[in-house]
Amino acid sequence: MVKEIVNSLPEASVVVIPQDSYYKDSSHVPVEERQFINFDHPDAFDWDLLVEQITMLREGKAIEQPTYSYITCTRQPEVVHIEPKEIIIIEGIMALVSPQLRDLMDLKVYVDADADDRLIRLIRRDVIERGRTPETVISRYERIVKEMHWEFIEPTKKFADIIIPQGGHNTKAIKTLQMSIGYFLKR
């Protein structure tokens, strides 16, 4: 959905900041113990750095965005240089969890996806991109991901200015969001 929105906007006007880039570094944790870290809990994120860098972008300053490896569960030495743009999209299922981050947002969007769609997306992503087995992904979903969704993600719906039902399949809502952002750019 984010790609569809970004592709409809002038390239020079938008930057996407993936929340996943701001996972805390786990390199100090022994490799065999990293599998027990709950990456679906808000404590897994470096909120201070994310808020600091979004603030910098809003002030017209460039940032050095961290990179994160899902394979090793560690922050990488490489960074991504990001120039400030008129539109900053913070992409992530926990983007509305932090009050400090919410305060930096002009428009807060919650994408409401069906539980089955969330599970299917998780399986596809973790098996294809992260080299995990379907069994491992399903087990993690049942033990951790589902509970974390209901405890931390679902409650943030109340902070959203716009709630998009049907996840990324809601073409009318996506078009409406594209028009809203386009209107903002013309102001």
Regions found by a protein language model. Name each.
Residues A12-P18, K24-T72, I87:
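Conserved nucleotide-sensing/catalytic segment adjacent to the nucleotide-binding pocket
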Residues M1-A12:
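A conserved segment at the C-terminal end of the G1
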Residues G60-Y68, A113-R118, E135:
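Conserved Switch II/interswitch segment of TRAFAC-class P-loop GTPases
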Residues E4, E83-P84, R124, I128, ...:
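NTP-dependent small-molecule kinase module
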Residues E11-V16, K108-Y110, D161-I163:
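Conserved beta-strand scaffold positions in the cores of enzyme catalytic domains, especially
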Residues Q76-R130, L185:
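ATP-dependent NMP and nucleoside kinases share a basic, alpha-helical "lid"
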Residues T67-Q76, I88-I93, R143-E147:
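Short gly/ser/thr-rich secondary-structure transition/capping motifs
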Residues A44-W47, V51, D116, P134, ...:
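Amphipathic alpha-helical transducer elements in NTP-driven molecular machines
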